[in-house]
């Protein structure tokens, strides 16, 4: 996190960050208004009041989908089976999207903000057990969370009869086994149950039939970290933070060959050009911007002409991409789009769960074709075949959203840089095809 002026009124997620980059432990967190939201909710509010405030605030999921958090909570609380047996809350901290590191920042530097958000959300959902599903490679984050959870227990924020409210909460930390597909909520639930991490068929949705058959809500780290400030400061304040129809702030960033790569908390509606030039300080000397991805490896490429778009769910979608995690990657003029997309598709192919045939067989086929094009050994119809494969991996034709997300960068790269892919067709084979066509025409 690069140093910028941060205050609680404008940077609710990051104002507590220390300049020395050390972790904010519970005593310091409490000195900076920590757990005041929890005390307010438990003493002054009913669970449904918390849900209504979060719904009115317009908070959307920060994991990439952008679904209304309050509505998601309402679906769980209104479920009939929910009234008979309690369910579970799961914090999705399995951050494995290439180029994304925002959740790691929140976990390692301000862990109690996340923990407070989890406890508040559990209270709103009337659940007594919550889980943090953490990426297995985040070893330092695991140690920090274990210590922070124990601190919260020692201070009486986790356990039985929290703050004399008759509300009980148990928080369990679970580390994953390195599967990207666990970012999908039902695959995560299967993994947490000890099963193979395959997505489930929906419906039933987790809000009805989730972890161990109980109603379950899965929320992202950044989403849950927003809850305390909303409860403490109110709906109007939260909405006024934004410059867009999407409310609040968002962790945004730029990586690639930029002078100052990083992540910053900025209002929704900040343009990509502002982030690139004012915060990332532009491209490195000798490089110019060729393309950029708005929010992770699984989002469509955009061009320099799109930099003036406000970074929010609606505007990025209208431009033909997705906001995703809002951590953008700059592609410089010296990068081969074929090589870049080849590496991206190799990742997605390797991370396929293998459950459905289009994804299991289609992605490796795409990788094989891209490898040939990268080595200038491509065949005449390779680019067309890539487009055909993409049509078979589009939304609605696979079991989950893994393959449709995987083909987004490929489709957009072909759309904007088709000549680079066509240049990978073997020249010798092209000349041979021309000769064959010439011979055939002479024979007619």
Swiss-Prot record:
[4Fe-4S] cluster binds at residues 353, 356, 359, 400. The gene is nuoF. It comes from Buchnera aphidicola subsp. Acyrthosiphon pisum (strain APS) (Acyrthosiphon pisum symbiotic bacterium). Composed of 13 different subunits. Subunits NuoCD, E, F, and G constitute the peripheral sector of the complex. GO terms for molecular function: 4 iron, 4 sulfur cluster binding; FMN binding; metal ion binding; NAD binding; NADH dehydrogenase (ubiquinone) activity; quinone binding. PANTHER family: NADH-QUINONE OXIDOREDUCTASE SUBUNIT F (PTHR43578:SF3). NCBIfam families: nuoF_fam, PRK11278.1, PRK13596.1. Its EC number is 7.1.1.-. NDH-1 shuttles electrons from NADH, via FMN and iron-sulfur (Fe-S) centers, to quinones in the respiratory chain. Couples the redox reaction to proton translocation (for every two electrons transferred, four hydrogen ions are translocated across the cytoplasmic membrane), and thus conserves the redox energy in a proton gradient. NAD(+) binds at residues 61-70. Its cofactor is FMN; [4Fe-4S] cluster. The lineage of its organism: Bacteria, Pseudomonadati, Pseudomonadota, Gammaproteobacteria, Enterobacterales. Gene3D superfamilies: 3.10.20.600, 6.10.250.1450, NADH-ubiquinone oxidoreductase 51kDa subunit (3.40.50.11540), NADH-ubiquinone oxidoreductase 51kDa subunit, iron-sulphur binding domain (1.20.1440.230). It comes from the Bacteria. Belongs to the complex I 51 kDa subunit family. This is NADH-quinone oxidoreductase subunit F. It holds the Pfam family Complex1_51K. Keywords: 4Fe-4S, Flavoprotein, FMN, Iron, Iron-sulfur, Metal-binding, NAD, Quinone, Translocase. FMN binds at residues 176-223. It catalyses: a quinone + NADH + 5 H(+)(in) = a quinol + NAD(+) + 4 H(+)(out). Binds 1 FMN.
